[in-house]
Amino acid sequence: MTMVYANIFLAFITSLMGLLMYRSHLMSSLLCLEGMMLSLFVMMTVTILNNHFTLASMTPIILLVFAACEAALGLSLLVMVSNTYGTDYVQNLNLLQC
């Protein structure tokens, strides 16, 4: 495993650990998800370029489209929750609370 792959893998693991540890605020969860998507995009792009996979060259762009949709939905949910409750706590998203 080259140093580039190791650094990208460490970036993904760091974002995943941040997502698992800092779950109280929605904004920090969204930032960790964006870090995971960025590291996946870079890993896919480097792998496709190194192995000369011409058929899979559209895959990173499709991943970026899904990441943009995820970011837009997450930010709209953040605005809705912060306008409704005044905070961005993830516990406000629980529908079973009264």
UniProtKB/Swiss-Prot annotation:
Mode of membrane association: Multi-pass membrane protein
Underlying gene: MT-ND4L
Enzyme class name: translocase
Complex and partners: Core subunit of respiratory chain NADH dehydrogenase (Complex I) which is composed of 45 different subunits.
Keyword Transport on entry: yes
Keywords: Electron transport, Membrane, Mitochondrion, Mitochondrion inner membrane, NAD, Respiratory chain, Translocase, Transmembrane, Transmembrane helix, Transport, Ubiquinone
Catalytic activity: a ubiquinone + NADH + 5 H(+)(in) = a ubiquinol + NAD(+) + 4 H(+)(out)
Known function: Core subunit of the mitochondrial membrane respiratory chain NADH dehydrogenase (Complex I) which catalyzes electron transfer from NADH through the respiratory chain, using ubiquinone as an electron acceptor. Part of the enzyme membrane arm which is embedded in the lipid bilayer and involved in proton translocation.
Main location per the UniProt record: mitochondrion
Gene Ontology molecular functions: NADH dehydrogenase (ubiquinone) activity
Subcellular location: Mitochondrion inner membrane
Similarity-based family: Belongs to the complex I subunit 4L family.
InterPro entries listed in its UniProt record: NADH_UbQ_OxRdtase_chain4L/K, NUOK/Mnh_C1-like
Protein name: NADH-ubiquinone oxidoreductase chain 4L
GO cellular component annotations of the record: mitochondrial inner membrane; respiratory chain complex I
Keyword Protease annotated: no
Record field: transmembrane: 1-21, 29-49, 61-81
GO BP annotation list: ATP synthesis coupled electron transport
EC number: 7.1.1.2
